[in-house]
Amino acid sequence: MRILGIETSCDETAASVVMRDEEGRGRILGDVVLSQLEEHSAYGGVVPEIAARAHVEALDTLIVEALLRAGVKLEDIDAIAATSGPGLIGGLIVGLMTGKAIARATGKPLYAVNHLEGHALTARLTDELQFPYLMLLVSGGHTQLILVKGVGEYERWGTTIDDALGEAFDKTAKLLGLPYPGGPAVERAARTGNPERFDFPRPLVGDARLDFSFSGLKTAVRQAAKSLEPVTEADIADICASFQRAISRTLRDRVGRSLKRFKAESASVAQPALVVAGGVAANQALRQTLQSLCDEHGFRFVAPPLSLCTDNAAMIAWAGAERLAAGLPADGLDVAPRSRWPLDAEAKALIGSGRRGAKA
């Protein structure tokens, strides 16, 4: 089967054609992503109105380009998959309405995909991973530990009670006068810094729960920078290195506990696996921490290519293919976008978790 995927949940406009064969193996036939970095960089973050307008201007052209790269026509497509949430509502409307129009015009089924499910299933596209497995999602809008049991079957083990990890990176960069996006800027600065100069806090470390908290770390960064004013480049490098060290130590505690829990509850799984997904997964220091943890606990560490960790339409197309192959029903043309859409509908909301970024 061939699926056309559309992604417009935040500040990337993307279209992709993905094939899934009868054995369940996937292949990306055509994939196009257009970043809006230049449009938002002057504001130090994503401006929803600008993002939505940029999606309108680019999406049609990107869909045509994805089909051309795949060497197929619309009539060769078996289904349409479009991100329906969570994310910025303006962008979601653009992508989902486009998907509906194509589905109506071609008579093909439409799958309104949860963006987080796209991340959760990417490892099956890239590494043919079998269920169940554990996923750490780290992005600008989410920091979650999720047990992936099957297509449409997810159990949230932990989440952030305040800032997402990507948000903490962006805010730290902004505090230090580093460019947007903040994640790569902080990582670059940290390479020449002393990670032990500042002993930043690690909230919730040692707690029996698997939840995260990063707002206190952000506050500590602000206080450190203020105490050094005017800060030098060396100070900034040391703050960034110490910031990353605090995050790595936090992940060792939270993720380490989750690996032990997975082994205890899924003892029959011969080769347990941890998947990392989301834009922050590009950070090499954090990848090294997770690889080390997996080595210690006997887990396979799966990190999809960086192009599939950040927002893309291939993962949306693949999620649609997985849902179609599993026999899950398509969505009606009256399906509505959802700015908030938890992957685990049974998970309880946490006190203090009201603000969660663009993709809450």
UniProtKB/Swiss-Prot annotation:
It catalyses: L-threonylcarbamoyladenylate + adenosine(37) in tRNA = N(6)-L-threonylcarbamoyladenosine(37) in tRNA + AMP + H(+). Binds 1 Fe(2+) ion per subunit. Substrate binds at L137, V138, S139, G140, G141, D170, G183, N283. It is found in: Cytoplasm. Fe cation binds at H115, H119, D311. It comes from the Bacteria. Its main location: cytoplasm. InterPro entries: ATPase_NBD, Gcp-like_dom, KAE1/TsaD, TsaD. It holds the Pfam family TsaD. GO terms for cellular component: cytoplasm. One of its GO terms (biological process) is tRNA threonylcarbamoyladenosine modification. Its cofactor is Fe(2+). GO terms for molecular function: iron ion binding; N(6)-L-threonylcarbamoyladenine synthase activity. Its EC number is 2.3.1.234. Required for the formation of a threonylcarbamoyl group on adenosine at position 37 (t(6)A37) in tRNAs that read codons beginning with adenine. Is involved in the transfer of the threonylcarbamoyl moiety of threonylcarbamoyl-AMP (TC-AMP) to the N6 group of A37, together with TsaE and TsaB. TsaD likely plays a direct catalytic role in this reaction. Belongs to the KAE1 / TsaD family. This is tRNA N6-adenosine threonylcarbamoyltransferase. It comes from Sinorhizobium medicae (strain WSM419). The gene is tsaD.
